Each structure stands twice: as C-alpha cells, then as structure tokens.
C-alpha cells in the first residue's frame, strides 16, 4: 500500500534527460501552481506556465513519462521514502488524524481497493524496493493509461502538434485491467467510538455509493453541497444557527 503516492514523489527528482530537480526549470520561467497529488483513483501532475514556456513543460512531462527509470537511484528512493513517512507521521498526529484509517477499514472490506489509505502503511513503505519502482513505472506510466490536458492560450491544432512532438515516441504500455471493487454493503449498521486528545467531539456518518464514472456521483456531490457544503446550507442552518448544538457542519461526496 502507498506505492502510488511514493512514486509520485519520485517523479519530481529528475528524469534521464532532465536530471535536476523537476521544479527548478519551471521556477526559472515563471511557472506557478506546479505540484502533484495522489488519491483513491488517480495520480495527477499539473503546472501553470507562460505560453512561451509550453514546450519546456511538455518536454519535462514527456521525459518523466517516457524516460524516468535511468534517473531513479536507491538513494533517491530512500530519501523520498523518508519524506513520505514524515508526511504520514505529521498527518497521523494531527487532530482526528487517524479517522480515515478507521473509515476505510470499516466501510470497505478487505481486498477492496479503498480498504487502505493512499499514503500506505509504514511496513509497506519500508519494504518498497527498486524492483517495485521499475515494475510500477512499466505497468502504470504508459500513455495509454494517462490523460493529458492543455487548457488556456492554445488552439487544438497547435496542441496536437506540440503533444505529438514531445510524446509521440513514447511506446504504449501494457493493457491495465480495470479494478472495480463494487459498492460494498454492510451486513448491519456499524458504529465505532474513537478516542483522541482533543477537547471536542465529532460525529461522522458515512455511506457508500457509486464511483466517479457512474451517474450518481454528480448528484451526490450536489446533494452534499446543499446539505452541508456552505455556511448557508441546510444542516448549518438547522444545527449551528437554529438549535445551536454544533459549532460546524460539513458534508461531502468523495
């Protein structure tokens, strides 16, 4: 567990034809908002660059998609392993930092892809090897498993020409089977009380529903906004303002 996120970190440590830190050349041309994130269904990488720096951004992205492994070393893996483990410790030590472990482990059965957190366990992070790095890159980072988005000061014809120039020689990766754990149903209502060293109490109620590619996803996100996504939402009005039994309410669909 946690390898997709660990690999995300390795993607910023240089590639075969751009071996330096990934961020440095972007900073030099005035790029902003450059980062990457990993969540349950995807890893994404993004940056906002001046129009004149588009070729640089496409070169950097294509080089780490097609030519990363020659720049990855055991030292880099060990370094980023430590960074991720510190990130995990910081998150775990935050107020309610262990909540999502309980949610995922109890709401989704063992074997379901959402049963574990994206940051992973310390044991799995410790065991990640260079062989794991090579296999993950080869299996998952082909162009047939990626979506490339260019938005802003560019037309379709220019976008296709630039993308073909920089990405056209990257070979297709292996076919990746779709992982579908289905929507689990608990055999009975489940309640759990967790203690934390915080002078407040939180109540969470969770339900499972279909994924992002299913029609109900947008409906659920909209419903969550109506219920608790805004300061004027229905649960805020009822529980915070009218009955004054809560200091805050939120609702969201993941």
Language-model regions: role of each:
Residues 59-64, 161-167:
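Short amphipathic alpha-helices in soluble, non-transmembrane regions
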Residues 74, 81, 130-166, 203:
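Non-catalytic, conformational "gating/processing" segments within enzyme and secreted inhibitor domains
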Residues 15-17, 66-68, 156-157, 167-173:
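Bacterial peptidoglycan biogenesis and beta-lactam-recognition machinery
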Residues 2-15:
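Active-site SXXK
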Residues 13-16, 48-79, 229-231, 253-254:
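M16/insulysin-pitrilysin zinc metalloprotease superfamily fold
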Residues 17-53, 90-145, 169-214, 225-254:
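Non-catalytic beta-strand/loop surface segments
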